[in-house]
Amino acid sequence: MFTLKKSMLLLFFLGTINLSLCQEERDAEEERRDEDNAKMEEIKRGIFSTVFKAGKGIVCGLTGLC
């Protein structure tokens, strides 16, 4: 009976550690995805701003209304 309790306690302990490690890995992966998404948003904003400025320059040059 005592060895059964020790075995169950050991399995519970190992399962708890395993669950904790899985959660840490999942959190780290979510952080990487968030960083990638933030980088993509920054790139999109940079491209949009550049295109907008270029379009504004072209319109200003063609019409002379600046």
From Swiss-Prot:
InterPro entries for this protein: Frog_antimicrobial_propeptide, Nigrocin
GO CC list: extracellular region
Distribution of this protein across tissues and organs: Expressed by the skin glands.
Subcellular location: Secreted
Keyword Signal: yes
One Pfam family linked to the record: FSAP_sig_propep
Predominant cellular place of this UniProt entry's protein: secreted
Signal sequence bounds: 1-22
Keywords (A to Z) from UniProt: Amphibian defense peptide, Antibiotic, Antimicrobial, Cleavage on pair of basic residues, Disulfide bond, Fungicide, Secreted, Signal
Chain residues in the propeptide: 23-43
Family designation: Belongs to the frog skin active peptide (FSAP) family. Brevinin subfamily.
Main function: Has antimicrobial activity against Gram-negative bacterium E.coli ATCC 8739 (MIC=25 ug), against Gram positive bacteria S.aureus ATCC 6538 (MIC=3.1 ug), methicillin-resistant S.aureus ATCC 43300 (MIC=12.5 ug), B.subtilis ATCC 6633 (MIC=12.5 ug) and against fungus C.albicans ATCC 90028 (MIC=50 ug).
Name of the protein described by the UniProt record: Nigrocin-2ISa
Organism: Odorrana ishikawae
